[in-house]
A protein has these predicted regions:
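Catalytic phosphate/metal-binding cores of nucleic-acid and nucleotide-processing enzymes, i.e., regions
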Residues: 1-101
């Protein structure tokens, strides 16, 4: 479900001409997951910019929760003036509105 949701968000980013990037996790041979980045854990998975706006957002299932590390990033980033979101499939109308502004 989250993969379909992510695909829909990515399609909308493209259609609305956002410059965007998604940090995708990778699976190790032992089956564990990691995101090959240096620094502190928990950075939002998506970054997008258009017309002077900067968005950082995390996509979650309807029951998914941010980790403690993600909450720290969200709090710190909210002080910068960037738009910080946690989006779920039920947020689709708001997502469309946000990416269409």
């Amino acid at each position: 479900m989250v993969a379909q949701f992510a695909s829909a968000v990515e399609d909308l980013l493209e259609v609305k001409h956002w410059l965007w990037c998604h940090y995708r996790p990778a699976r190790r041979k032992d089956g564990s997951w990691y995101t090959p980045l240096s620094g502190h854990k928990g950075l939002m998975d998506y970054i997008a910019t258009k017309d002077g706006r900067l968005l950082l957002f995390e996509l979650k299932s309807d029951k998914g929760k941010l980790t403690d590390d993600q909450l720290i990033w969200k709090c710190e980033l909210s002080l910068t003036g960037a738009e910080i979101y946690t989006w779920r499939p039920t947020d689709w109308p708001f997502i469309q509105e946000t990416l269409t502004k």
